Curated annotation (Swiss-Prot):
Pathway: Amino-acid biosynthesis; L-histidine biosynthesis; L-histidine from 5-phospho-alpha-D-ribose 1-diphosphate: step 5/9. HAMAP family: HisF. CDD domains: HisF. Keywords: Amino-acid biosynthesis, Cytoplasm, Histidine biosynthesis, Lyase. One of its GO terms (biological process) is L-histidine biosynthetic process. It comes from Ruegeria sp. (strain TM1040) (Silicibacter sp.). Its EC number is 4.3.2.10. It is an enzyme of class 4 (lyase). GO terms for cellular component: cytoplasm. Belongs to the HisA/HisF family. This is Imidazole glycerol phosphate synthase subunit HisF. Its main location: cytoplasm. Heterodimer of HisH and HisF. It catalyses: 5-[(5-phospho-1-deoxy-D-ribulos-1-ylimino)methylamino]-1-(5-phospho-beta-D-ribosyl)imidazole-4-carboxamide + L-glutamine = D-erythro-1-(imidazol-4-yl)glycerol 3-phosphate + 5-amino-1-(5-phospho-beta-D-ribosyl)imidazole-4-carboxamide + L-glutamate + H(+).
Amino acid sequence: MLKTRLIPCLDVADGRVVKGVNFVGLRDAGDPVEAARAYDAAGADEICFLDIHATHENRGTMFDMVRRTAEQCFVPLTVGGGVRTKDDVRALLLAGADKVSFNSAAVANPDVIAEAADQFGSQCIVCAIDAKSVAPGKWEIFTHGGRRETGIDAVEFARLVTAKGAGEILLTSMDRDGTKSGFNLEMTRAISDAVNVPVIASGGVGTLDHLVDGVTKGGASAVLAASIFHFGEYTVQEAKEHMIANGIPMRLQ
């Protein structure tokens, strides 16, 4: 049976790890390379590294930080933020990323997913979907850090990008992000059921039970969290042990 993955997320702005509430009011949570190294040592299954200002401020992802992180971390590293072209994917893979995540660029041009997947393989192409609830059972994609509405249905878009070749969906509930009220389980389940690739649930973890719910109720293949780990509320080990106690297969060190 495939093990469920636990993924700490390092949101980076101006070279530092930050964790905001609903992408506003950022708090400094440390140096990204140090944080990644600590999570590697703590038993994280993967690390997700997102430059949250790259798209908004229209600058490329910080390749040097990726390179330094990859040199010191030996778990898979997913990198996103400001990724626009297959050349960006190539540069990040060369810098040491294992997977590269498209977000706003894929919404503007879903074919960029196909171009990147054709060249590098679906296994290293992630599509990040940031969505908000707009009506019962309906979720809409927002881009540029949640600042721009698109009118695009999140479930339909997930089907489209996986058909184009995305090997994984990183699904963030913008309504829940930073609130510690738990994942949007209905949305997570709807998208998990709609696609045949792994879905990473993101946005809203406040307790260890929320991680369990993402898998058992949301159908996610992996769960992502930031602030509960960054500020020492729980360790990766505690989270994994709690998930195992609830019948979820996890990798322990």
